Amino acid sequence: MRKLWAPNWLSRRQNANPTRDQSRHALMAWLAAALMSAGAAHAQLNVEITGVGSNQFPVATANFQGEAQAPQNLTAIIRSDLTNSGRFRNVDPAGATVAESAQVDLGSWKAKGADAFVAGSVTPTSNGQYEVRFRLYDTAKGQSLGGLAFTVTQGQLRVTAHKIADYIYEKLLGERGVFATRLSYVSKVGNRYQLLISDSDGQNAQIALTSTEPIISPAWSPDGRRVAYVSFEAKKPVVYVHDLATGKRVVVSNQKGNNSAPSWSPDGQHLAVSLSRDGNTQIYQVNADGSGLRRLTRSSAIDTEPQFSPDGRSIYFTSDRGGAPQIYRMPASGEESGAAQRVTFKGSYNVSPRISPDGKYLAYISRSGGFRLQLQDLSNGDVTSLTDTTNDESPSFAANGKYILYATRVGGRSVLAAVSTDGRTKQVLSLQSGAVREPSWGPFMQ
């Protein structure tokens, strides 16, 4: 039985057919990376901006009238979102409180250096909810760019602030924002693994699963309601689909050997998975309820890490069929419908394919002086290295395709990082204590 070509990848993915000793080695790699203190109270991610884009858009967001009556500071969240994107520069409102219904002297805000201005209000309602209103202005043209009104519960205030930031982002930059999306990731503190779901800024983290065994490879369903992942709680890798609203789980694949690397089809009806049930790891398709297993590859190599293209017509995957791991593309119906074609040619070791939401770019990890995140233009094959770290893994595109979330190591710690696809905006997201890895960026909220 063939071994996987790199122990480093084995410790991250468990996609081959490891012996019991190899599985134990993979677990020890996690243990070595973890810090041994803190608990669930420290599940929130801390964000550090390490690079920003050029030509940042200056925006002033006044304090919303009445927001002191709400348990969330909406304007603080909005300002933080805009700053963290690297695309905006917050202009200090100097403590000004302005409602969306007020007459605004836009010229004075323009004189303060703001090209856009945001005003709003938060009003408690008689049934315990909150009415949130805002308006966005173009100070240069002296005109309104529109606004929205929301009636929400206390628990919805935070996501409402993210939605306001998304509105500002789209109106001013002409592309959809991702502040109201969610992240999934795995934390490791002591001997406890947790699958966590948080807002896009790493806050408001909720525990989906806690285990004393590793959890890897979370993958969001297209509607954002379910997460597929691999759990070792049965003392072997098993693929589950987890309903986030109910907490109910379905075993999607518990075949003999390894069950790993789940990837959703764009319609949310199927998953591609990697299984070693018949020997070498190969790619299969299975229905989201665990039925209808069908083999897609039949090579003598290791075929793993499948990823559907956004149009559902192709599956990208990693294979060593050429002697070393490279990324290939085949029809979504499998190699019986057409031979797989090699996609990556720069470098001798390329793994972990992820396709941008528009299908134009491929993010992957290349071994070149370490493991580095790369971005390939699928139209011409041009490749750009996006990071200066050397332990990158698990890339995941934001829903708008403008940012990539990945795991890496900084200062000896396992952290998450995000980089814009132009390489200019960079963030590091870390836990107060413990290791964090296996990130997946969720889709636009339905």
Curated annotation (Swiss-Prot):
Compartment(s): Periplasm
Cell cycle as UniProt keyword: yes
Keywords on record: Cell cycle, Cell division, Periplasm, Signal
Superkingdom of the organism of origin: Bacteria
Cellular component, GO annotation: periplasmic space
Disulphide bond pairs: none
Main location: periplasm
Record GO biological process: cell division; protein import
Sections of the chain in a coiled coil: none
Pfam family, one: TolB_N
InterPro entries tied to this protein: 6-blade_b-propeller_TolB-like, PD40, Tol-Pal_TolB, TolB_N
Recorded family membership: Belongs to the TolB family.
UniProt function note: Part of the Tol-Pal system, which plays a role in outer membrane invagination during cell division and is important for maintaining outer membrane integrity.
Matching HAMAP family: TolB (MF_00671)
Name of the protein described by the UniProt record: Tol-Pal system protein TolB
